[in-house]
Each structure stands twice: as C-alpha cells, then as structure tokens.
A protein has these predicted regions:
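Residue at a conserved register position within TPR or TPR-like alpha-solenoid repeats
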Residues: 28, 67-68, 102, 148, ...
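Structural motif corresponding to the intra-repeat A-B loop/turn of tetratricopeptide repeats
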Residues: 31, 70-71, 105, 151
C-alpha cells in the first residue's frame, strides 16, 4: 500500500476526486489519525455525493468509527450513521452499526427499532470497499433479540437466540448467545 505522502502527492492534481480522498482517509484511519481520516471521509462524502454512492455510504459509516472512542462525540457518531441511512436507506450496514451502538449505550427501544428496520434490507448487495463490521443479517437479529429482552419481549428474544444457534454465525455471537441463555436459565 502506498504511504499517505504518496497518496496525497498522486491526488494533488485531482483533490476533488472522491476515490483519492477515500484512499487517503483509509490510510489515516489505519494509523490511528482519526481526525485527519474524518476530514477525508467528509471530503469523499461531499465530492462523491452524485457520482460515488458506495464510497459516500462507506465514508459516512467509517466516520462513526473515527469518533467512537472520543467522549462527547456521541451525536456526531449517531448523525453520521443517520446520514448514511438517509443516503442509502435500502442497505443494512448502517442500521446494524447504529443498532449496536444503541445496544452498547442501553437505548433498548432505539436498538430494537433500527435492528428491525435493517432486517428489511438484508438482501445480498454490492460489497462495500471497507470493513464496517457488518457480518450479516444474523447480527441484526442478535441486536433485536438483546434489545427485545430488555423491552419485555422475552419469548421473542428466546426464539431468536435459539434460532441463531442453529445457523452458521461468528463464534463471538454464538458465545454471547450461549452466555445470555445461561444467565436467564434457558437453553
């Protein structure tokens, strides 16, 4: 992979190109320079709005990861994901990332709602050019089950958890489901 300096130099004659800005953003994010990465993701979203929808959508989601560990930036995180949903509402990834964030902050109604909305759009689509940590529809079902439990939907949650255990899911989801079921005394 090219260095940041090489990427910037090669993009210097075409800095409005969303592809160049996206590559630079990724390079900055990979070395932990999230403020710089965010700036280039924003440039990607602005310059690619009408021409590069997948890059724009991916950039808006990655912005949420850039601010994830920064205290006081919760609204920026939420807004970047809501903008991604507004921009491409028929894709599941931003719904998942937002639902998972709501789970982590114990906003159960919001978690449940965005998981449910995301489940409407889980058909196979063009792969994103960057990892946004969306493993598949089962992750939205997991978020729905966890938040449903806290919202008083015990039977629905147990049913979803048990159904997920019959599927090919990532080990961390399987162990989390097994742990949750052991805590509530169900299997």
């Amino acid at each position: 992979m090219a260095t940041i300096e090489e990427l910037i130099e090669s993009a210097s004659s075409d800095m409005l190109n969303p592809e160049h800005n996206f590559k630079i953003a990724r390079a900055y994010e990979e070395i932990g320079q999230t403020a710089a990465a965010m700036s280039f993701y924003l440039r990607t979203a602005e310059y690619g709005y009408n021409t590069h929808p997948i890059l724009v959508y991916s950039s808006l989601i990655r912005i949420s990861y850039c601010v994830l560990d920064q205290s006081g930036r919760e609204h920026t995180l939420e807004n970047s994901l809501l903008q991604a949903i507004q921009y491409m509402p028929a894709r599941p990834e931003a719904y998942f990332v937002l639902s998972r964030q709501y789970e982590r902050t114990q906003k159960w109604q919001e978690c449940y709602t965005f998981a449910e909305l995301g489940l409407m759009y889980t058909n196979r689509m063009e792969q994103l050019p960057v990892n946004v940590e969306y493993p598949g529809a089962y992750a939205l079902l997991f978020e729905k089950a966890v938040s449903g439990w806290w919202r008083g939907r015990k039977d629905e949650s147990l049913s979803i958890f048990n159904e997920l255990l019959t599927q090919d899911i990532a080990p961390e989801y399987r162990s989390s489901i097994e742990y949750n079921l052991s805590i509530i005394g169900q299997k």
